[in-house]
UniProtKB/Swiss-Prot annotation:
E.C. code: 2.1.3.3
Disulfide bonds: none
One GO MF term attached to the UniProt entry: ornithine carbamoyltransferase activity
Protein function: Reversibly catalyzes the transfer of the carbamoyl group from carbamoyl phosphate (CP) to the N(epsilon) atom of ornithine (ORN) to produce L-citrulline.
Protein's cellular compartments: Cytoplasm
Protein name: Ornithine carbamoyltransferase
Organism field: Methylococcus capsulatus (strain ATCC 33009 / NCIMB 11132 / Bath)
GO BP term (any one): arginine biosynthetic process via ornithine
């Protein structure tokens, strides 16, 4: 039987997505020891450095009674040019699950195609589904179901934005995206999402009456050479107190971190009462524990 993978949110049904959110909330509240993954091993392949992804997966496996192995390009033949499919075949004969944080989304797709065990997308250039599990858990904890609500995405139409496009369809919320011309999410993703997703360039229109406001860095890892150009393009796309004032009175603010205060978000908003970024960061642990349990014990 082929394993279940988590390459994008589209690998889940709406019901499964909601069940994972509920399970993550339950696991967060659980105090007594619980080790459903005893003697299981998670292989973690990192092409890009990370704080939250590595720590949350390692701690999650330890709390579940399992263990994890960290593999950087220096530690594997992948870094020396071994075909991706060969690495997938070999690793999946030795570990129980593989998580990859890579540059190219195609790398994760190939791993999933050739792996004998579940493959998890820990982040690629196109999608970041693990972060959306945590984001949605955080919203449900603070405000209840997100169905019928309005989410405003401000800034780059990047991997996070594109994962929000998937989430909007699965959880039935309205997504309004405001980004500079030339930085929109992939057109085919937006078209496939239908009426629940709108793309424009005016931040005020996007945020007006929103229940959740989300942003991300202007230049992601690997885009450092574009920093000056992007700073100019995004200068009018900062989430600050004046912009948040246009949102719903009890709107929340999220950012997947790390944040650059004074660029994509003001320090006042990041540290303010509407910000739930620290809960959001913590929930990477709980949401991914729910995901690991789902993939490895079903």
């Amino acid at each position: 039987m082929k394993p279940r993978h988590f390459v994008t949110l589209r690998d889940l049904s709406s019901a499964e997505f909601r069940a994972l959110i509920a399970r993550a909330i339950d696991l967060k509240a659980r105090k007594e020891p619980y080790e459903p993954l005893k003697n299981k091993v998670l292989g973690m392949v990192f092409e890009k450095s990370s704080t939250r992804t590595r720590v949350s997966f390692e701690v999650g496996m330890a709390q579940f009674g399992g263990s994890s192995i960290f593999l950087s390009p220096r530690d594997t033949q992948l870094g020396r040019g071994e075909p991706i499919e060969d690495s997938a075949r070999v690793l999946s004969r030795m570990v129980d699950c593989i998580m990859l944080r890579t540059h190219a989304h195609r790398t994760v797709e190939i791993f999933a195609e050739y792996s004998r065990v579940p493959v998890i997308n820990g982040l690629t250039d196109r999608f970041h589904p693990c972060q959306l599990l945590a984001d949605m858990q955080t919203y449900f904890e603070h405000r209840g179901d997100i169905a019928g609500k309005t989410v405003a995405w401000i800034g780059d139409g990047n991997n996070m934005c594109q994962t929000y496009v998937h989430a909007a369809g699965l959880l039935d919320f309205r997504l309004r995206i405001a980004c500079p011309p030339g930085y929109e999410p992939e057109a085919e993703l937006v078209e496939a999402a239908g009426k629940c997703v709108e793309v424009g360039h005016d931040v005020r229109t996007a945020v007006n009456g929103a229940d959740l406001v989300v942003t991300d860095v202007w230049a992601s890892m690997g885009q450092e050479s574009e920093q000056t150009e992007r700073t100019g393009a995004f200068r009018d796309y900062q989430v600050n107190a004046a912009l948040m004032a246009l949102a719903h009175a009890d709107a929340l603010f999220m950012h997947c971190l790390p944040a650059h205060r004074g660029e994509e978000v003001s320090a006042e908003v990041l540290e303010g009462p509407q910000s739930v970024v620290w809960d959001e960061a913590e929930n990477r642990l709980h949401a991914q524990k729910a995901l690991l349990e789902f993939l490895l014990t079903a």
